[in-house]
Structure formats: structure tokens, C-alpha cells
């Protein structure tokens, strides 16, 4: 039995939380993600950039009522990577099942 390697991008608690949220809502504002993850703006910003650089999310910056707004959206690659991560975790919980 060989354990599948876990995706290092998703293995961070905050990045996994962001992707998990985006899986369910598809896209969300930075403030929503910050509130739901209880993270600081600085830490969340760094982790969002790592997810963006990996191609797991798209980030759009715009203005709404003269206020800056950052929208994060899950990509197909992000969805596939999340599903692979979950499958890898399941293989750890059921090592005799393939």
C-alpha cells in the first residue's frame, strides 16, 4: 500500500479553507473569506496569491460604490486539485481500499 502525496498548496489550513469555501460558493469577496476563515487581511492576501499563482483561483480587483473590492473565483484546476486532495486523504483513512 502506497500513500498518495498530499498537494502542498492545499495542505495549508488557510489555503484549504479558502478553496473549500470557494468550492461551495464558486466565487466570493475577500471580506467574506476573511470573515469565514477568521484570518488577518495580510495572511489571507499572501495565501490567496499562492492559490492564484498555482492556478487554483482567479482574482479580480474592481470598485464597488467607490470602494475597492477583491473577488476570488475557483478555477477548474482548483476544483480538480481539491477533489484529488480529498481522494488522497480518503486513501489515508481507508488504506486497504483502492
Regions found by a protein language model. Name each.
Residues 43:
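Residues in the helix-turn-helix
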Residues 47:
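Residues within the DNA-recognition helix of helix-turn-helix
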Residues 2-3, 20, 79-98:
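Amphipathic alpha-helical dimerization/coiled-coil segments
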Residues 55:
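Glycine-centered, phosphate/nucleic-acid-interacting loop/turn motifs that mediate DNA/RNA or nucleotide
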Residues 59:
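Short beta-strand "wing" residues that participate in macromolecule-binding interfaces
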Residues 2-40, 62-65, 69-73:
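N-terminal helix-turn-helix DNA-binding core of bacterial DNA-binding proteins
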